[in-house]
């Protein structure tokens, strides 16, 4: 009798366990069905949303050149300054620029050494579509910049990348207005010192519209840390045949501020001498208030000049 009770008890427990398992299974099935996207009756499977993002490729430029939006070179976004007392923080600062370009900047003020890094990042990124992650090591980037690879420069490089991420530009070049960071962000492996960074895809519209310019990288490297000469080199690289500029205007465009007029003129003339030394300028004419540079044209610039002369014989 006791054995029959024991068998009956085990049967009852087994049935209860089976009911519990089936209840759990039904509950799980209901949750999975509720998680599925709702399809309106009679309309079948829902179509995926239309893709509105447009893939924009970088234009191709030679390995020995560095490029960015021309508004960067035609403004004081990366001024010719040396910050010995720390960098000022700017709040929607209206920067000097040429006609047709307007830039407001918020963040720690940048300089030409920041532009060195930014141009190198764009060089790495330009092999891929905008928004694609670009990979590089701190060592390789420092070597490309001609800098030593000691601990101090690794720290310096990271500070520049953070500064480029943190600065916000509101930049208009003719009909295109971009607002955002120059670098979108990224990650770093602290063991290998390898980086992954992204460039904001919206910045691509300057390139798509043809509003970009490039410069000779070896010439820029030859200028070493001469901030004034580097800024002038970048600005003049957006011109085929630049006309006379007043010293005052040049000083504003490359960010030479808070200096005496006489010192500014002397600084600019020395910078023109440097541009002549590296072969960028064949010569220049400096007057009392203006300076006119004569550029050694690239083959593509020579073709452009010939084409304009053919179209407009009055230029001869």
Regions found by a protein language model. Give the residues of each.
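Charged, alpha-helix-forming regions
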Residues: 1-316
């Amino acid at each position: 009798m006791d054995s029959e009770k024991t068998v009956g008890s085990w049967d009852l427990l087994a049935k209860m366990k089976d009911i519990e398992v089936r209840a759990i299974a039904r509950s799980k099935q209901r949750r999975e069905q509720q998680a599925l996207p709702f399809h309106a009756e009679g309309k079948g499977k829902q179509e995926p949303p239309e893709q509105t993002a447009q893939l924009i490729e970088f234009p191709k430029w030679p390995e020995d050149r560095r490029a960015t939006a021309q508004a960067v070179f035609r403004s004081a976004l990366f001024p010719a300054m040396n910050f010995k007392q720390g960098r000022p923080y700017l709040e929607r600062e209206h920067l000097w620029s040429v006609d047709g370009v307007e830039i407001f900047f918020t963040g720690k003020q940048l300089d030409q050494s920041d532009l060195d890094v930014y141009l190198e990042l764009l060089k790495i990124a330009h092999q891929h579509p905008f928004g694609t992650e670009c990979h590089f090591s701190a060592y390789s980037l420092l070597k490309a910049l001609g800098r030593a690879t000691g601990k101090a420069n690794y720290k310096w490089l990271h500070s520049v990348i953070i500064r480029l991420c943190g600065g916000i530009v509101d930049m208009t070049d003719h009909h295109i207005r971009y607002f955002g960071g120059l670098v979108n962000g990224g990650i770093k492996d602290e063991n290998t010192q390898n980086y992954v960074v992204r460039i904001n895809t919206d910045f691509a519209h300057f390139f798509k519209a043809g509003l970009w310019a490039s410069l000779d990288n070896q010439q820029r490297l030859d200028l070493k840390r001469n901030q004034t000469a580097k800024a002038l080199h970048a600005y003049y690289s957006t011109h085929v045949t630049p006309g006379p500029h007043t010293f005052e205007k040049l000083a504003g465009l490359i960010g030479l501020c808070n200096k005496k007029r006489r010192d500014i003129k002397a600084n600019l003339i020395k910078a023109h001498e440097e541009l002549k030394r590296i072969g960028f300028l064949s010569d220049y004419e400096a007057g009392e208030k203006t300076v006119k540079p004569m550029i050694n044209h690239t083959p593509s610039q020579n073709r452009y000049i010939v084409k304009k002369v053919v179209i407009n014989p009055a230029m001869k």
